[in-house]
Amino acid sequence: MSILSKIQRTQPLILNLANFVTPQRVADVISFIGASPLMTSEIAELESLVEISDAVVVNIGTISESTYPLFLEACRLANQKAKPLILDPVAVNIPFRASIVKRLSQEVKFNIIRGNSAEIAWFADKKSLNKGIDALESNIDNEHARLAAKKTGTVIIETGKVDIISNGHEEMYVDTDSPLFKINVGCGDMLTAVVGTFAAVSDDLFTAAYEATKFFGEAGMIATKQVQNLPGNFVNSLLDTLYQTTHEIK
């Protein structure tokens, strides 16, 4: 049975600690592929929410010192209850965010990390020409992804012109780049949510990471052709394509 079929059959519940820029897009993409999104900003309800969830997705895009305890507790509970824990380390190469991720990593174990080449280079202790959340350079060299996977003991997804998925021993590649991913803020957040959804129903997180990245990228290519020179329509077309593809699966 394919991962998409499992998602349709089980309708996994995905708990998100989202940033406050793109929560609607994150919730939509989870719902459109047949799962159920759940958001929270309340630490008191975390234990019960993690208990009923099938995966936990954490995005540090708008994290602060005051919200750090919420993130730490969500991650700790995900580990304790053996729920897949996915990290989107938005702009982790900025010092404050770097300190946050270092502190989290000392306390919890992430199962999958999804970031652009600059973010993944940080986990590999390497420098990158990229800035912030934008991917500016080619990333076809798998060195950073493999090294980051080895250092963290985590499946790494490095998105860019060619997406690289590494477990530290082998790599898989997805060549489905679209310029519209970059200019539509939140597409990376959406991909991370899709990865979390695939991980929720799979015992093989390396394969789940690859299949999720490929599924999302191929939908992006179709959506790019559909909207042509109307990039503002891209996300809606992307969601429609993901929905249609999901519901063609029996």
UniProtKB/Swiss-Prot annotation:
It catalyses: 5-(2-hydroxyethyl)-4-methylthiazole + ATP = 4-methyl-5-(2-phosphooxyethyl)-thiazole + ADP + H(+). Substrate binds at M39, G186. CDD domains: THZ_kinase. The keyword Magnesium applies. GO terms for molecular function: ATP binding; hydroxyethylthiazole kinase activity; magnesium ion binding. It comes from the Bacteria. SUPFAM superfamilies: Ribokinase-like (SSF53613). Its cofactor is Mg(2+). It is an enzyme of class 2 (transferase). Pathway: Cofactor biosynthesis; thiamine diphosphate biosynthesis; 4-methyl-5-(2-phosphoethyl)-thiazole from 5-(2-hydroxyethyl)-4-methylthiazole: step 1/1. The keyword ATP-binding applies. ATP binds at R114, T159. One of its GO terms (biological process) is thiamine diphosphate biosynthetic process. Its EC number is 2.7.1.50. Keywords: ATP-binding, Kinase, Magnesium, Metal-binding, Nucleotide-binding, Thiamine biosynthesis, Transferase. Belongs to the Thz kinase family. Catalyzes the phosphorylation of the hydroxyl group of 4-methyl-5-beta-hydroxyethylthiazole (THZ). This is Hydroxyethylthiazole kinase.
